[in-house]
Amino acid sequence: MLQQLTTGFGSTLVIFFLTLLFSLPLGMVVYFGRVSRFKPLSWIVKAYISIMRGTPLMLQLLLWYFGPFYLWGMNIGGYKFTAIILGCSLNYAAYFAEIYRSGIESIPSGQYEAAQLLGYNKSQTFFKIVLPQVVKIVLPSVTNEVI
């Protein structure tokens, strides 16, 4: 009995860390799609975020596990772990994207103007000025979502 519990606990930790590893950067990619000036991409990403945040995680996991079989006849019985990681990562990426969006939008416009006056381009402004402040702002929300 104890051996089964430790095996399950180990699997849970692996799922947790892999989900975190994939969903944190994917959330930033989703955020960039969400705020894209290319409207079709922005609409698609907004729909993705709404669907992922608006449906239960268990339903999404069932979709990722059983969906390929019922849609394309693919048997993925040996890929249970992959379906879990994929489903959890895509779900949490949507949540992290919204957390990042709220943190980045909370940065005052004066920060961007000051960076422009100092001669920074957009990527330098984001990575050297905005992102360090955003990390401090979003850390409590990200920690809450991780727990």
Predicted feature residues:
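Transmembrane alpha-helices and adjacent helix-loop boundaries
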Residues: 1-147
